[in-house]
Amino acid sequence: MAEGGSSEEELRAIVHNLGVSPFFLGTFDKRFPGFISSQRMACAIVNTAGRETGGVHWLAMAWNPRSKTFYMFDPFGFSDSKLKQVYSFEYEGLLRRSAIASSPDRCVTLAKSNETIQGPNSAACGLFCCMFLHAFVNWPDDPFDHNPTMGPLKSVPNYKLNDPTVQYVLWGNQEKLYKFLEKHSAYFRAHAAAIKARTAFNKLKQ
């Protein structure tokens, strides 16, 4: 992200603090080559745009080889068609490029977040991705919910993303996100004021 949002360096530092590093392949733009090993648990943070644009929106992707599940986490919970429409981003090709698609039985489960936890004008997508990856490495069989990291967040149907009546719920999620990072990330604590300013709930309106 350029003026608002999170830089790649920032996300890598926070991910390291959260204990994700042993499984973390890195931050990538939309040209992410996919997961290179079908036998190893792995994850990444991927932007929907090319690096040359400065970035647009962060997603998290993760692979659990035990259950053969490919997780795609989008804090907005956009549908496949909406991701393509809004960002011209398609993950099907990415999935095909991954080594996991060439596993012997080619039986891969795609699990995708389909509800919204982030406000429409928030620039905290990268931070939410870090939070999700913490859940993934600790509870790889159910990282979206039913765990102490993501469980406290409240989701709303994606079609209500801009509904004024749910903004307090989404604002509350961002406050919980900041508190989580304050507790678990030394990098976040050291740069909290600047990070909060760049990822503010109303940042895209400023």
UniProtKB/Swiss-Prot annotation:
Induction info: Expressed in the late phase of the viral replicative cycle.
Gene Ontology BP annotations: proteolysis
Catalysed reactions listed for this entry: Cleaves proteins of the adenovirus and its host cell at two consensus sites: -Yaa-Xaa-Gly-Gly-|-Xaa- and -Yaa-Xaa-Gly-Xaa-|-Gly- (in which Yaa is Met, Ile or Leu, and Xaa is any amino acid)
GO cellular component term, pick one: host cell nucleus
Record-listed E.C. numbers: 3.4.22.39
The UniProt record lists the keyword NADP: no
One of the record's GO molecular function terms: cysteine-type endopeptidase activity
Site-annotated residues for Cleavage: 54-55
Regulation affecting activity: Requires DNA and protease cofactor for maximal activation. Inside nascent virions, becomes partially activated by binding to the viral DNA, allowing it to cleave the cofactor that binds to the protease and fully activates it. Actin, like the viral protease cofactor, seems to act as a cofactor in the cleavage of cytokeratin 18 and of actin itself.
Cross-referenced Pfam families: Peptidase_C5 (PF00770)
Keywords on record: Autocatalytic cleavage, Disulfide bond, DNA-binding, Host nucleus, Hydrolase, Late protein, Protease, Thiol protease, Virion
Protein localization: Virion; Host nucleus
UniProt miscellaneous comment: All late proteins expressed from the major late promoter are produced by alternative splicing and alternative polyadenylation of the same gene giving rise to non-overlapping ORFs. A leader sequence is present in the N-terminus of all these mRNAs and is recognized by the viral shutoff protein to provide expression although conventional translation via ribosome scanning from the cap has been shut off in the host cell.
Description of how the protein assembles with itself and partners: Interacts with protease cofactor pVI-C; this interaction is necessary for protease activation.
Family indicated by similarity: Belongs to the peptidase C5 family.
Function recorded in the entry: Cleaves viral precursor proteins (pTP, pIIIa, pVI, pVII, pVIII, and pX) inside newly assembled particles giving rise to mature virions. Protease complexed to its cofactor slides along the viral DNA to specifically locate and cleave the viral precursors. Mature virions have a weakened organization compared to the unmature virions, thereby facilitating subsequent uncoating. Without maturation, the particle lacks infectivity and is unable to uncoat. Late in adenovirus infection, in the cytoplasm, may participate in the cytoskeleton destruction. Cleaves host cell cytoskeletal keratins K7 and K18.
Name recorded for this polypeptide: Protease
